[in-house]
């Protein structure tokens, strides 16, 4: 790692030259989600004073979105703290008395029904019949046994055979089907039910991975994702409380809301020794202003453009303001990178990083909350799971647009009713979730009601009094829910995505110009809130280490 206090030819080091003039490195963080806030807070706590966070939307939190309706908080985004042992999100929430335990540390059968440890999942068929409890338990034991086998390919280096196509879904479907068909104790009718249940479980798995289909998730890389031991927890007051606690260590003027970025111009000093390729429109200190978010323009060493000492990075905002910086930490989602990497970076990203962006996957998992006047489900029921009997032999989890509702795997009962009222939370993912997002509330409520009537066999279920749903796929600032290792990708691609720019170290090139964080950049904890937070702290630590000598010397 190149140090800002390097000896020898440090006079020619663009980073050292800039620091002699400015005194403090300027860091711009793009995104005020968990990763961006964690990075900014860590830098500020270690003595960095010229830090700016640019958030495209009107609020902080990123993919944490707690919506308050009356006295109740609903989570459109992150919902659970997954595991407690060493989980920094858990530690922050626990220290502030925010937690409520929802499951024990074991992998639950429904695995997405984490609102309550109590009750049972009701597996219902499209003919309006409930699958017997013993059949559900037998199938769940078999499925979980095969699921554990999917972990062994990465963890034990087992070779993947060609028949599986290196796909979690293909492997699981085939293994479970063969075991069901070969079972001499089951009747043909029971076998048909269990075969149909495979697709329902794989829909749940697809929602959990936020893939269009679990068939697209890499079998050889699947076991690298690591589950933190301990119980799952929810935060009754809203997951946004964690975001707010994280932001408490950041002065308000550091965060600029409604500030989308158009382009990051990096490697400016080496490419243009006399100045940037675009003209600055914003002068003034972007951190040490009046404390009210304005620009004082009183400190030319920190805030004004200096063509004799060009900045390594220039952030061009959509409102045409241009912010020069020594370092930029990019926390945008993988979905945004996939959509915008060609225009978001100048010069273009290295081929290796572009390839990693292409290979890694991100999809959409959406929630549909339905509120009813009275419950039509029993007090022992914690979820309603939909099993289509005509999918017993199906080999796909893709449906035509007019059948998008078939991707809804089921509805969880929000618990306790004293807090939530009588509310169901449905799950849908993939391209079908995008179709759902394009429908209006009335249409979605109507279709969900018809499904509930069909699967429960109760034609008298009323329409919900209220509907609330997420739309992560069509949101231009996210373009998806969270990442996964797609077939053809591996943890090595996560490392490539996280690698700072520029790749080469030179006395002529400022180091660590563009850094990358966010859940998709954490090799073990991608897709999680703790992975996002840890990735932000990781990138901050790179800069803290780089400037260690500077801050140890003091003023």
Curated annotation (Swiss-Prot):
FAD binds at residues 35, 55, 63, 79-80, 261, 519, 528-529. Signal peptide: none annotated. GO terms for biological process: spermine catabolic process. Pathway: Amine and polyamine degradation; spermine degradation. Pfam families: Amino_oxidase. It is found in: Cytoplasm. Residues 271-307 are annotated as: Disordered. Flavoenzyme which catalyzes the oxidation of spermine to spermidine. Can also use N(1)-acetylspermine and spermidine as substrates, with different affinity depending on the isoform (isozyme) and on the experimental conditions. Plays an important role in the regulation of polyamine intracellular concentration and has the potential to act as a determinant of cellular sensitivity to the antitumor polyamine analogs. May contribute to beta-alanine production via aldehyde dehydrogenase conversion of 3-amino-propanal. Belongs to the flavin monoamine oxidase family. This is Spermine oxidase. It comes from Mus musculus. The lineage of its organism: Eukaryota, Metazoa, Chordata, Craniata, Vertebrata.
